[in-house]
């Protein structure tokens, strides 16, 4: 069958099945998938712009702006105006946000390890490398 060897379908199906398993844990922790992606992408970095976050969480910038404002009201993130470009805002994770996302980061790493366990380390790294190349090529 065509779809059984069609790359976009295979990628979408793999993403759907792998992500759904972990997204249940995200929702059990009280976050939406987009909130999880925002917190995870801010963990370990000083700050990101709303535009960068929109690219990472695969959402439109106005949607991410609304999420960031709501998350800031819950003290999960902090929004700071950009001094170079008044249209932009910097977003950073708060200590509360970091504390809440830390257990999920550990669960995500364990989930990834379990998903990739049948491949072994060389194939796992090769798969990630190939996916990163495809992503860069398409952008």
Model-derived features: positions:
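N-terminal leader segment of winged-helix/HTH proteins
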Residues: 1-29, 76
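Charged, amphipathic alpha-helical coiled-coil/dimerization segments
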Residues: 19, 69-132
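Short alpha-helical "packing" element that flanks the helix-turn-helix/winged-helix DNA-binding module
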Residues: 38-39
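Short capping segments at the starts of secondary-structure elements
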Residues: 45-49
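Alpha-helical transmembrane segments and membrane-interface helix-loop junctions
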Residues: 50, 132, 136-139
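Residues within helix-turn-helix
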Residues: 50-51, 62, 69, 89
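The alpha-helix within a helix-turn-helix
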Residues: 54
């Amino acid at each position: 069958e065509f779809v059984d060897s069609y790359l976009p379908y295979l990628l979408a199906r793999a993403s759907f099945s792998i992500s759904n398993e972990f997204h249940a844990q995200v929702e059990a922790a009280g976050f939406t998938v987009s909130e999880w992606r925002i917190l995870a992408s801010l963990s370990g970095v000083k700050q990101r712009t709303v535009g960068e976050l929109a690219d990472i969480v695969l959402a439109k910038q106005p949607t991410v702006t609304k999420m960031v404002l709501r998350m800031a009201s819950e003290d999960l993130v902090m929004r700071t105006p950009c001094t170079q470009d008044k249209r932009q805002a910097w977003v950073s994770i708060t200590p509360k946000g970091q504390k809440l996302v830390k257990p999920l980061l550990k669960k995500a790493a364990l989930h990834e390890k379990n998903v990739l366990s049948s491949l072994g380390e060389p194939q796992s790294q090769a798969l990630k490398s190939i996916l990163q190349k495809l992503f860069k090529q398409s952008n």
